[in-house]
Amino acid sequence: MDHSMSKKLHDEALLHIVGGVNSPSRSNKGVGGGIPVTMERASGAYFYDVDGNKYIDYLAAFGPIITGHAHPHITEAITKAAQNGVLYGTPTKHEITFAKMLKEAIPSLEKVRFTNSGTEAVMTTIRVARAYTGRDKIIKFAGCYHGHFDLVLVEAGSGPSTLGIPDSAGVTKSTAEEVITVPFNDFASFKEALAVWGDQVAAVLVEPIVGNFGMVAPEDGFLEAVNELAHANGSLVIYDEVITAFRFMYGGAQNYLGVIPDLTAMGKIIGGGLPIGAYGGRIDIMEKVAPLGPAYQAGTHAGNPASILSGIACLEVLQEEGLYERFEKYGSMLKDGIEKAALKHGIAVTVNQIVGALTVYFTEDPVTNYAEAGATNGELFGRFFKGMLEEGINLAPSKYEAWFITSAHSEADILETIQAVDTVFGKMVQDN
């Protein structure tokens, strides 16, 4: 494929934008470098770049675009918002409608509040949990991404009984020491951490199904055990459903798994492609939020009509009968096709697939936690990513990210993708 215009634009972007991108994940650093493709437009399941190339898209903007690009119902809602004014700074009837829709879909949300992003939503749930419990520390799980605010840019210390250390320049040591990080799916380590720090732990922050070191499901009984022990300790349980809300069913991963948290943070899908976040939970906890309580959260754009109307339209689309069954069907088809192609060419892969989301790891071993994901072959993934791009398939540029199937993908798209995988695996073997 010709990418000459993408290269020209990236060279220009480097002169004006830090690193040439507005989020590090877009830089292709995770696939060994190279020029990121600049997109011109998107429609349905397809991307079109500035050089005129067409791609089947599984990036889905890192998750939000579950209905495909430029869905007509969502486009109509955004157009209506633009015509009526996109920002008021006052209450609107639409935010009530949307709050009711979220509560009906995810019953643990007894009260909700809107923010501008998933990062803001997670950040505020931690503040609210601290206000409710009178404690300061949180426990989180290694490799789970919860946004880019200081408190969650923390990696594990030397073990479950040690405090965290900064994972980014600019995060202070004192901030990192408010966080204990333990391996996902490792209840023994969680139990040890709580035994040491329990009376200081305000909340346990969990991705109920991990989406940030690939798609990784909790082992049987893990979330239930975490809930039980956290509550026995007087700590709250926060589910970060920024990726998972409405991903696997019309509702949250908590509905899908049957395990209920005290607070939930959401984003991505619920905005229909526009910036949004939301959080909610038990009434007695949520009433700690201003103006009813002492935990402050505000935002100029929070609850803006454009994002709210886009979100309402997105959830209306997701109520289509049989949609999630189709996601499951296509997800299973992709997993099966990738595994068969890998076996044919003698390439070791593990495919973690949950409904319409999956991750292809270059390893023969299971992946159930961050350390196992980190041990997979990133060099092979980088070659695979670039090969798929040349075959007209757009993936996330990192071995840790997921493929997302949207309502716009057809069975023909899935079959074309499987054929591309077979072609790329063949070239990878030939190149060796």
From Swiss-Prot:
Q: Which GO terms describe its cellular component?
A: cytoplasm
Q: What class of enzyme is it?
A: isomerase
The cofactors required by this protein are: pyridoxal 5'-phosphate
State the pathway, as annotated in the record. Answer: Porphyrin-containing compound metabolism; protoporphyrin-IX biosynthesis; 5-aminolevulinate from L-glutamyl-tRNA(Glu): step 2/2
Spell out the reaction equation it catalyses.
Answer: (S)-4-amino-5-oxopentanoate = 5-aminolevulinate
The alphabetical list of record keywords is: Cytoplasm, Isomerase, Porphyrin biosynthesis, Pyridoxal phosphate
Q: Which InterPro entries match?
A: 4pyrrol_synth_GluAld_NH2Trfase, Aminotrans_3, Aminotrans_3_PPA_site, PyrdxlP-dep_Trfase, PyrdxlP-dep_Trfase_major, PyrdxlP-dep_Trfase_small
Q: Which GO terms describe its molecular function?
A: glutamate-1-semialdehyde 2,1-aminomutase activity; pyridoxal phosphate binding; transaminase activity
Q: Which residues carry this modification: N6-(pyridoxal phosphate)lysine?
A: K268
Q: Which PROSITE patterns match?
A: AA_TRANSFER_CLASS_3 (PS00600)
What EC designation does it have?
5.4.3.8
One Pfam annotation, family name?
Aminotran_3
Q: Where in the cell is it found?
A: Cytoplasm
**HAMAP family the UniProt entry points to:** HemL_aminotrans_3 (MF_00375)
Subunit structure, briefly? Homodimer.
Provide the protein name: Glutamate-1-semialdehyde 2,1-aminomutase 2
